[in-house]
């Protein structure tokens, strides 16, 4: 297996992988499914094994949804801060899964949590990535009103990643929700402006504009498809690629 992996040369040297918090739920209705964590750790480990540097951002929707409580009257800033804490919890769980698979990992938080995580520091993050560690960026940007998608794009730009890989439940971007519309058609490739003009809802406006302004390629793919992540990194055409026209 190791020989097979080493024979496949990576197309990307450094990636930023964005996972939704919901992805960690698996078949559960809430929280974290350990089986999903272990499978994701294994797939990330395959990338590390062929020399790819992996930055990781995980959402917090499996543990906390601020939007619902905001609609019920909770202060938006308070809700966003609670959501940031949920991403830290997911980051700690993922670090544990990676380390149990003998993959070195570091959790960095945009909010200072002495004794729990390292505080986010770009130069330190890049040193650890260069040393073969998976770096998990948690607590979003550290500011309310910014999504974890925006945080993922921001961190990717800061650490000079080659691509943002957004893991979803479907194998790319479609003209409509393929779960609701059987006639929905998949896009193989899009430009940032097409995503914005068609209002495709791939990521929020801030995230897409960040990628467009800094020319950061973005690929949307299905993390539930075994081997999809590795296939992308060695040059396969999984999902939908979003880049400059």
Swiss-Prot record:
GO cellular component: cytosol
Nucleotide-binding recorded as keyword: yes
Positions of UMP binding: 60, 80, 141-148
Pfam families to which the protein is assigned, alphabetical: AA_kinase (PF00696)
EC number(s) recorded for this UniProt protein: 2.7.4.22
GO BP field: 'de novo' CTP biosynthetic process; UDP biosynthetic process
Catalysed conversion reaction: UMP + ATP = UDP + ADP
Record's keyword annotation contains Ribosomal protein: no
GO molecular function, one term: UMP kinase activity
Entry-linked Gene3D superfamilies: Acetylglutamate kinase-like
Annotated compartments: Cytoplasm
InterPro entries, per database record: AceGlu_kinase-like_sf (IPR036393), Asp/Glu/Uridylate_kinase (IPR001048), Uridylate_kinase (IPR011817), Uridylate_kinase_bac (IPR015963)
Uppermost EC category: transferase
Pathway where it operates: Pyrimidine metabolism; CTP biosynthesis via de novo pathway; UDP from UMP (UMPK route): step 1/1
Regulation: Inhibited by UTP.
Keywords: ATP-binding, Cytoplasm, Kinase, Nucleotide-binding, Pyrimidine biosynthesis, Transferase
Binding positions (ATP): 18-21, 61, 65, 168, 174, 177
Job description of the protein: Catalyzes the reversible phosphorylation of UMP to UDP.
NCBIfam families: pyrH_bact (TIGR02075)
Similarity comment: Belongs to the UMP kinase family.
PANTHER family: URIDYLATE KINASE, URIDYLATE KINASE PUMPKIN, CHLOROPLASTIC
Quaternary assembly: Homohexamer.
Name this protein carries in UniProt: Uridylate kinase
The gene coding this protein: pyrH
């Amino acid at each position: 297996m190791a020989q097979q992996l080493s024979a496949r040369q990576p197309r990307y040297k450094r990636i930023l992988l964005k996972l939704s918090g919901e992805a960690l739920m698996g078949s559960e209705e809430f929280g974290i499914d350990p089986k999903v964590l272990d499978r994701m750790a294994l797939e990330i480990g395959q990338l590390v094994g062929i020399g790819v540097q992996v930055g990781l951002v995980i959402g917090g929707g499996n543990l906390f949804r601020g939007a619902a409580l905001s609609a019920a009257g909770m202060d938006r800033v308070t809700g966003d801060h609670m959501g940031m804490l949920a991403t830290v919890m997911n980051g700690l769980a993922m670090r544990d899964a990676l380390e149990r698979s003998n993959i070195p990992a570091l959790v960095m938080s945009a909010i200072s949590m002495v004794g729990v995580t390292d505080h986010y520091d770009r130069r330190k993050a890049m040193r650890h990535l260069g040393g073969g560690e998976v770096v998990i960026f948690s607590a979003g940007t550290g500011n309310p009103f910014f999504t974890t998608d925006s945080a993922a794009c921001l961190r990717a730009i800061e650490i000079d990643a080659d691509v943002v890989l957004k893991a979803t439940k479907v194998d790319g971007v479609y003209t409509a929700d393929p779960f609701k519309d059987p006639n929905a058609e998949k896009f193989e490739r899009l430009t940032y402006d097409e995503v914005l003009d068609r209002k495709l809802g791939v990521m929020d406006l801030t995230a897409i504009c960040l990628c467009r302004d800094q020319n950061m390629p973005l690929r949307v793919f299905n993390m539930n498809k075994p081997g999809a992540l590795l296939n992308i990194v060695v040059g396969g055409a999984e999902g939908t690629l979003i880049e400059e026209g």
